From Swiss-Prot:
The lineage of its organism: Eukaryota, Viridiplantae, Streptophyta, Embryophyta, Tracheophyta. Residues 1-14 form a propeptide. The modification Phosphothreonine is found at T15. InterPro entries: PS_antenna-like, PS_II_antenna-like_sf, PSII_PsbC, PSII_PsbC_sf. It comes from Daucus carota. PSII is composed of 1 copy each of membrane proteins PsbA, PsbB, PsbC, PsbD, PsbE, PsbF, PsbH, PsbI, PsbJ, PsbK, PsbL, PsbM, PsbT, PsbX, PsbY, PsbZ, Psb30/Ycf12, at least 3 peripheral proteins of the oxygen-evolving complex and a large number of cofactors. It forms dimeric complexes. This is Photosystem II CP43 reaction center protein.
Length: 473
């Protein structure tokens, strides 16, 4: 007899409420958390929580490797990276792999190797994650006391913090070693239009490095985002790596002071909220860095910054009209200010027109034309090189504007223009993720503080309305 319906649809469906889908320590009855509360079920199961974290690391590294190989497979060496929607290859190129003078890609094999290495390590992490989630000990305290912990154990928590800080410090020094000893990194400021070079003369002067932290975040100052030479960036990583490593050792060797024990909440959810806050700050800083900084994120790979594209347009038309006989030093614009050049309130010569708001842009193609008082009129008349004209015309037409449907350029652009800058994607995504992480911080911090104060209720699971409803099956 032909069955009209699959018999399977009459079999009982495992739902949240019939309690039979029980894995020890992972069902609603024993943990107080339903399946959708994710790792909350594992708060007191250090072995299973380790599995979740290792598996998560495996997913992250798998994405990195897979996306890396996807970008390599689609990469066209004749086109700039920023025209191809790439976000991983520009990072590898910035580290000096596979590129030569002017940011030209001469070898894609290092990119392939990077993707394969990430895929292989993701398999190792994936196996470890599955092992610890399904097969390994539920708790580590008994068999591996070094890896065990209790959330309330303040001394153990600061020891774990110290280990993490040391790992971050080692990560910072990996960049330092790459720049110093292992082939160098890409320097967009290298003479003649950018090149890979070893960074030899590090900036270790604390007044310079920490001076960045004391700068105003506003125009012309730009806080740490204003860093514009690699000596400062690599020297900053020496300082940062050293502080992280010494701070990590200090946290391993010491116990929290009394004021810290009183001021902080010591629970798993509190630590989660602190971590989310830190990641949120990182996200916002990364957003500003990739949007404004063309030294750590060279325009050869990521496309021009917004201010850079705007200044490039002013420069391109200055070059054109000067060739046609305009006197760019004295021509007046429709507002009575200089059409091509004007003076800023502090007296230096800057580009006129709407781009005056971006007067503080620094870019390798423009700096040779500056003198002690801003743009130098005699250099603009005599010293403009063809490579500067080509670079600015290219950047003018690749501003980091664009909509979600990939119709790039200004709002009036024709639909045939299919370009969205990686800067737009990276800045927007990091801002949005930073914001979500901040909201998550507020949520978990509020819950952790309420629980510590003793009035955290949550949903009343005994009288939850859904418990009195007919089960789905």
């Amino acid at each position: 007899m032909k069955t009209l319906y699959s018999l399977r649809r009459f079999y009982p469906v495992e739902t949240l409420f019939n309690g039979t889908l029980a894995l020890a320590g992972r069902d609603q009855e024993t943990t107080g958390f339903a399946w959708w509360a994710g790792n909350a079920r594992l708060i007191n199961l250090s072995g299973k929580l380790l599995g979740a974290h290792v598996a998560h690391a495996g997913l992250i590294v798998f994405w990195a490797g897979g996306m890396n190989l996807f970008e390599v497979a689609h990469f066209v060496p004749e086109k700039p990276m920023y025209e191809q929607g790439l976000i991983l290859l520009p990072h590898l190129a910035t580290l000096g792999w596979g590129v030569g003078p002017g940011g030209e890609v001469i070898d894609t094999f290092p990119y392939f190797v990077s993707g394969v290495l990430h895929l292989i390590s993701s398999a190792v992490l994936g196996f470890g994650g599955i092992y610890h989630a399904l097969l390994g000990p539920e708790t580590l305290e008994e068999s591996f006391p070094f890896f065990g912990y209790v959330w309330k154990d303040r001394n153990k928590m600061t020891t774990i913090l110290g280990i993490h800080l040391i790992l971050l410090g080692i990560g910072a020094f990996l960049l330092v070693f790459k720049a110093l000893y292992f082939g160098g990194v890409y320097d967009t400021w290298a003479p003649g239009g950018g090149d890979v070079r070893k960074i030899t003369n590090l900036t270790l002067n604390p007044s310079i490095i920490f001076g960045y932290l004391l700068k105003s975040p506003f125009g012309g100052e730009g806080w740490i985002v204003s860093v514009d030479d690699l000596e400062d960036i690599i020297g900053g990583h020496v300082w940062l790596g050293s502080i992280c490593i010494f701070g990590g050792i200090w946290h391993i060797l010491t116990k929290p002071f009394a004021w810290a024990r009183r001021a902080l909440v010591w629970s798993g959810e509190a630590y989660l909220s602190y971590s989310l806050a830190a990641l949120s700050v990182f996200g916002f800083i990364a957003c500003c860095f990739v949007w404004f900084n063309n030294t750590a994120y060279p325009s050869e790979f990521y496309g021009p910054t917004g201010p850079e594209a705007s200044q490039a347009q002013a420069f391109t038309f200055l070059v054109r009209d000067q060739r046609l006989g305009a006197n760019v030093g004295s021509a007046q614009g429709p507002t009575g200010l200089g059409k091509y050049l004007m003076r800023s309130p502090t007296g230096e010569v800057i580009f006129g027109g709407e781009t005056m708001r971006f007067w503080d842009l620094r870019a390798p193609w423009l700096e040779p034309l500056r003198g002690p008082n801003g743009l130098d009129l005699s250099r603009l008349k005599k010293d403009i090189q063809p490579w500067q004209e080509r670079r600015s015309a290219e950047y003018m037409t690749h501003a980091p504007l664009g909509s979600l449907n990939s119709v790039g350029g200004v709002a009036t652009e024709i639909n045939a223009v299919n370009y969205v800058s990686p800067r737009s994607w990276l800045a927007t995504s990091h801002f949005v993720l930073g914001f979500f992480l901040f909201v998550g911080h507020l949520w978990h911090a509020g819950r952790a503080r309420a629980a510590a104060a003793g009035f955290e209720k949550g949903i009343d699971r005994d009288f939850e309305p859904v418990l009195s409803m007919t089960p789905l099956n």
